[in-house]
Amino acid sequence: MGDKWIGVALSDPLRILASPLVILRRDDDAKTVENIEALVKTHQPDLLVIGLPVSLNGTIGPQAEKVKAFSGLLSQSLNTEIIFRDERFSTDEARRKMNDSGKNNKTVRDDAAAAAVILQDYLDETNPPCFQP
């Protein structure tokens, strides 16, 4: 969640695969909350996974504090659980995956692709493997 854009991703119903959905322009907080409320109403997620911009040394800096403050506004208006995930290197990983797949920034914006990376990391960590060798 940046100062200008918010990348949004969704998982499939089985919570196996995350895909980029959309990017939202970050206007004033009220308008941004309204846009996220509309997405939540449409897609009805079980929870929101929000990327937290932790500093390289692992500390919570000013940008992470902004994200937490905005998330507080979201939690007041939504009846949806919010989980924070470290978003360090998610944009780099998203760009690598887009390059590997032949997609470029015109096809999928970095922000939405990074949101999918963050969500996929959460899904991989919380869902046990479906198949055992």
Swiss-Prot record:
Q: What is its main location?
A: cytoplasm
Which Pfam family, any one, appears in the UniProt record? RuvX
**Compartment(s) of residence:** Cytoplasm
Write one Gene Ontology MF term. Answer: nuclease activity
Q: Which GO terms of type biological process are on file?
A: rRNA 5'-end processing
Q: Which UniProt keywords are listed? A: Cytoplasm, Hydrolase, Nuclease, Ribosome biogenesis
The UniProt record lists the keyword Cell cycle: no
Enzyme Commission no: 3.1.-.-
Assigned GO CC terms: cytosol
List, alphabetically, the HAMAP family matched: Nuclease_YqgF (MF_00651)
NCBIfam families for the chain: RNAse_H_YqgF (TIGR00250)
The similarity comment for this entry is: Belongs to the YqgF nuclease family.
Q: What does this protein do?
A: Could be a nuclease involved in processing of the 5'-end of pre-16S rRNA.
PANTHER family in the cross-refs: POLYNUCLEOTIDYL TRANSFERASE, RIBONUCLEASE H-LIKE SUPERFAMILY PROTEIN (PTHR33317:SF4)
This one is known as Putative pre-16S rRNA nuclease
